[in-house]
Regions:
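One-carbon transfer enzymes
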Residues: 1-191
Length: 191
């Protein structure tokens, strides 16, 4: 399992561990909340909207995944079948020799990634044949990052969802296995 460290990523790890043995877990430190890597300085309003979105997303995740006592991801019981093989890394170290060595010692049957930066071929080649990515957007329309911001910005909230696809060297480009969109309810906001 290779995930980011945001509450939604930790939640997935906890849910998977309740049904499967997680033999190893690489956690990429994504910071408190993701800021777009592109510079939108030519559009001050877009910059402001992005800042509002990321703050609201962070608060919504905290409220749902941490403050809600029925789902609390900070409880050690939530990760019942996660082995002690856990390594944390930065974006810079995600494709490093230390991560390669860690993965080499695991021998997983399947690999799942969610919420991380791009893995290079040196890491992809170490993973088992059965490897999948959970992408926080509806591919191929919303690839890359901040994929829950853009559908609303483009007035397509029905395109907010997740895609599970085979993990390949092409960014969010492997064959799609499943997609799911959110249920729209009158009065809901983006968060």
């Amino acid at each position: 399992l290779i995930t980011g460290n945001h509450p939604r990523h930790l939640y997935l790890a906890g849910i998977l561990s309740q049904f499967h043995d997680v033999v190893g877990w690489v956690i990429e430190d994504r910071g408190e909340f993701l800021r777009p890597e592109s510079n939108y300085s030519e559009d001050a309003l877009l910059n402001e909207l992005c800042a509002i979105h990321f703050k609201a997303r962070y608060l919504a995740e905290k409220r749902f995944f941490i403050d809600d006592s029925t789902i609390n991801i900070t409880s050690s019981n939530f990760y019942s079948n996660v082995s002690k093989n856990i390594i944390r890394c930065s974006k810079k170290d995600l494709n490093s020799l230390s991560i390669s060595n860690f993965i080499n010692g695991l021998y997983p049957d399947i690999a799942i990634t969610y919420g991380i930066h791009i893995l290079d071929n040196s890491i992809l080649n170490l993973l088992p044949i059965e490897k999948y990515n959970i992408h926080g957007g509806i591919s191929p329309w919303y690839r890359g990052s901040i994929t829950h911001f853009w559908p609303s910005y483009m007035l397509e909230p029905q395109m907010t969802g997740l895609t599970m696809h085979r993990l390949t060297a092409v960014l969010d480009g492997g064959p799609i296995l499943h997609q799911n969109t959110g249920i729209l309810v009158r009065g809901d906001g983006l968060h």
